[in-house]
Amino acid sequence: MSAGGAVEPGLPAAAAAPSAAPARDPGPGHLFRPISAEDEEQQPTEIESLCMNCYRNGMTRLLLTKIPFFREIIVSSFSCEHCGWNNTEIQSAGRIQDQGVRYTLTVRAQEDMDREVVKTDSATTRIPELDFEIPAFSQKGALTTVEGLISRAISGLEQDQPTRRANEEAVAERIDEFIAKLKELKQVASPFTLIIDDPSGNSFVENPHAPRKDDALVITHYNRTLQQEEMLGLQAEAPEEKPEEEDIRNEVLQFNTNCPECNAPAQTNMKLVQIPHFKEVIIMATNCENCGHRTNEVKSGGAVEPLGTRITFHITDPSDMTRDLLKSETCSVEIPELEFELGMAVLGGKFTTLEGMLKDIRELVTKNPFTLGDSSSPGQTEKLQEFSQKLDQILEGILKAHFIMDDPAGNSYLQNVYAPEDDPEMKVEHYKRTFDQNEELGLNDMKTEGYETGLPAQR
């Protein structure tokens, strides 16, 4: 059953009028401030707007903010003092991500209903057990909870029921039965599955067990189809042909992009690098002159390997922290002693040292907004402090631990200081990928031979 009509009542929030109340300066180089209840300078911009309910002037408040560990968003709230109508929504202010994202959550307990959810306009929400779907662009973006998503769908289905009962009583009865099923889900009498599929990659579902792995939540990153690219207003660019005499291995290429920290225009340098005893990779480094943020990312310069690679390294000495490390986008990281797992695509591709990778993990976990401030619980804070202490002990060489890199594409690498001899503390395994791993890499439907057959004849 589709919930195309499951939209909150009312028309779009407002039609902006020319007059606007002045807002405080968010600070040099930072248009989007991190969301914080303690930041007194973070004030909304007030704009006098036309109320689409009574056609008199109301007030729209816009707050440009950034959720740490996530994206920039615009929170808007409209209220009309004349008729009392109000409306709130959020919009993603960040860039469309390189890949789409699919969150599959198995709801087993009432605690799962309280998970924070960021759902953008382009996200599709499904509950397979009820054959229920909220299509993309049928609802405004929302910062809510799992229970809030279901309540919003119920409200959308109930809003036209009086009219249906008068004109189509049979249809209204079926919708009443379906609404009752949705209300039963809120009681979590039995487990059900919630899927949020966002081609833009800007939706988010909270992991309340961070920094530990969430067994109830599966996050899948995927490449968009041409139809999804068109739906998002993106235009695929054809790859440029490279002249035969051109050799870019000794050149540093430059192109314009946006800073991932402040979203200001920045310049990215790109170069092909040959890693000893491994393969060729592409290193991209961005330096923002506006806010001073620096970042680097690594892309594989070759194809997907025939076999996946799992590298298990036993950290026994502080000198191990200096080993070079290449983590591709398809590589997951696990530290069993900390019960910690870093999924694919998190942190992106990186060419750093083992010490740099562990510090990035610590920064990633400690800046999780749902473990900070008023939204955190004492138990979460204690777990986070214990995790940080153990990670510091590993960095200082006090605590021995295993560092596992699992890359189904086989494009990750950890330096062997004994090369070409074997490293006694490192185990490298090559394995055959599963069907699901090939599906995630887009290999199952790839046709490399005989693809010319079946194509329409050219005139």
Swiss-Prot record:
Q: Where is the composition biased (Low complexity)?
A: 1-29
Q: Which SMART domains match?
A: Zpr1 (SM00709)
User: InterPro entries given for it?
Assistant: Znf_ZPR1, ZPR1, ZPR1_A/B_dom, ZPR1_jr_dom, ZPR1_Znf1/2
Q: What is its main location?
A: nucleus
Keyword field: Cell projection, Cytoplasm, Differentiation, Metal-binding, mRNA processing, mRNA splicing, Nucleus, Repeat, Zinc, Zinc-finger
Q: Name one GO cellular component term.
A: nucleolus
Keyword Cell membrane in annotation? no
**Segments for region (Disordered):** 1-43, 438-459
**Localized where?**
Nucleus; Cytoplasm; Nucleus, Nucleolus; Cytoplasm, Perinuclear region
A GO molecular-function term, please? zinc ion binding
Task: List residue spans of C4-type Zn fingers.
Answer: 51-83, 259-291
One GO-annotated biological process of the protein:
negative regulation of motor neuron apoptotic process
* Protein family membership: Belongs to the ZPR1 family.
**NCBIfam families the record matches:** ZPR1_znf
Q: How does it assemble?
A: Component of an import snRNP complex composed of KPNB1, SNUPN, SMN1 and ZNF259. Interacts (via C-terminal region) with SMN1 (via C-terminal region); the interaction occurs after treatment with serum. Interacts with elongation factor 1-alpha EEF1A1; the interaction occurs in a epidermal growth factor (EGF)-dependent manner. Interacts (via zinc fingers) with EGFR (via C-terminal cytoplasmic kinase domain); the interaction is negatively regulated in response to epidermal growth factor (EGF) stimulation and EGFR kinase activity. May also bind to the PDGFR receptor.
What role is this protein assigned? Acts as a signaling molecule that communicates proliferative growth signals from the cytoplasm to the nucleus. Plays a role for the localization and accumulation of the survival motor neuron protein SMN1 in sub-nuclear bodies, including gems and Cajal bodies. Induces neuron differentiation and stimulates axonal growth and formation of growth cone in spinal cord motor neurons. Plays a role in the splicing of cellular pre-mRNAs. May be involved in H(2)O(2)-induced neuronal cell death.
- Protein name as it appears in the record: Zinc finger protein ZPR1
Organism from which the protein derives: Bos taurus (Bovine)
Tell me the name of the encoding gene: ZNF259
